[in-house]
Amino acid sequence: MFEKITLAHKDLFSRFLSAQKIVLSDVSFTNCFLWQHARLIQVAVIRDCLVIQTTYKNQKPFYFYPIGKNAFECVEELLKLEKNLRFHSLTLEQKDDLKDNFVGVFDFTYNRDRSDYVYSIEELIALKGKKYHKKKNHLNQFLTNYANFVYEKISPQNKKEVLEASQAWFLESQTDDIGLINENKGIQSVLENYESLDVKGGLVRVNGEIVSFSFGEVLNEESALIHIEKARTDIAGAYQIINQQLLLNEFSHLTYANREEDLGLEGLRRSKMSYNPVFLIDKYEAIARN
């Protein structure tokens, strides 16, 4: 019933996701495609709903909320298939729907580590006011030191160069962090299949050399979803410039930027909070009692 996710499933995702407003980063096709190296991600259509199943090594699978008109019927089928059925990354509305329609069936918990951070695109481009003072200083330092910088869209012509830069920075980091190793594999997968995905990306050059890059996609009619942002750590302001330039050049017609979760990592949480999110999308987990 379930199939391991491949590029061939992109149209299937598009068919279901386009029928309703998606706000979570988790269920984007690009997000699933990027992170398939970190866990087994499988998909199926059950009761005319898209079902995404995720399994980490040596763990039981979990599911995202079914995407489609017959979500409750789909949940009933999943309860038959899976003992102690587990859902992750439920919105408050989805959690309440399960609680109200499957009374006493599930136990629920709030998972702060998975909350999506959502920012004002207008604010991140302008960086005005006291709350952005440090970020603006970093940006101004970059603009002063590298006034000749060039922004380019990621394209078939330069994606190989982006991949080479990404790989070089990864090797220089000498990391043994499995999350970063899998992220690196995911970046490679996205760049190698760039034209087939609905992503918009950009890079910044200084004296012809790539110093930062980022890519994301349109999530819904008001929001962008930023998947990846990478920069040279020895160049002050390299992260701030690509953050600003990607939003300015690719997503300025939208209102919000979803920059995904912090995974409970203290440094990542500090970094994400320092950009002053306008709100967080809370996520919940559910486990069936059977």
Model regions and ranges:
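Short, conserved active-site entrance elements at the starts or edges of catalytic domains
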Residues: Q157-E209
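Short, extreme N-terminal leader segments that mark the start of a protein/domain
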Residues: M1-A19, T233, Y284, N290
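Acyltransferase donor/substrate-recognition loop-hinge adjacent to the catalytic core
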Residues: G104-D176
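Short catalytic-loop micro-motif centered on adjacent basic/acidic residues
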Residues: H88, E152, Y256-R259
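Aromatic (often tryptophan-rich) hydrophobic motifs at membrane interfaces
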Residues: K200-R289
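Conserved donor-binding loop and adjoining core beta-sheet/short helix segment
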Residues: D26-Q94, R205-T233
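Intrinsically disordered, low-complexity, positively charged segments
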Residues: A8-Q36
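Short, glycine/charge-rich beta-strand/loop segments that flank catalytic centers
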Residues: L85-N101, R112-D116
